[in-house]
């Protein structure tokens, strides 16, 4: 899963993806990431820009660092290449900002969960327009939940969902941390 504004390191080893990434590097174009599950491939995904190739291997494999840019919806899939291509439309967020209190609550919950789980994360800027994505992208949350966030076009609704999700998992994390310390 990839969210706008969130970094994602990738190890490219399959021939079809080596071809795709080489083409993206040559043309300086992004590629799309969609969630695949037992139910199929999602219609909503996120474009990824390649920030850098961090390592090249002798056999053609490579490690790259990407960052999510735009949410998109697949309109039509083309299967005439080794890798899938698609006609897409970019998805814009609805106008409006979440209430300040919700932003502060989300940042506070995120910091507590990161601390309890021993995750080293730097707190995202509270003024970020995609705060919900930055928070959800920095923690190992349920993929179905993450996909629901990706589909939601309102930052306020996404942030409300993130707050609800984090509040729901926090008691279990507190119990686990307490048991670890005893």
Protein language model annotation of sequence segments:
Residues 1-182:
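N-terminal low-complexity, acidic/polar interaction/targeting segments
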């Amino acid at each position: 899963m990839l969210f706008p504004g969130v970094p994602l390191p990738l190890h490219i080893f399959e021939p079809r993806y080596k071809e795709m990434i080489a083409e993206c590097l040559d043309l300086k174009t992004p590629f799309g990431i969609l969630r695949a599950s037992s139910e199929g491939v999602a219609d909503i995904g996120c474009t990824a820009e390649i920030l850098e190739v961090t390592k090249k291997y002798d056999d053609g494999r490579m490690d790259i660092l990407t960052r999510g840019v735009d949410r998109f919806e697949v309109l039509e899939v083309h299967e005439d290449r080794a890798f899938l291509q698609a006609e897409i439309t970019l998805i814009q967020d609805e106008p409006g900002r979440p209430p300040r209190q919700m932003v502060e609550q989300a940042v506070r919950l995120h910091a507590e969960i990161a601390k309890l789980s021993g995750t080293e994360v730097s707190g995202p800027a509270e003024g970020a327009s995609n705060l919900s994505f930055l928070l959800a992208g920095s923690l190992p949350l349920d993929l179905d939940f993450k996909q629901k966030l990706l589909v939601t076009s309102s930052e306020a609704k996404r942030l409300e969902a993130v707050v609800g999700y984090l509040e729901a998992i926090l008691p279990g994390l507190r119990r686990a941390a307490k048991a670890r310390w005893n």
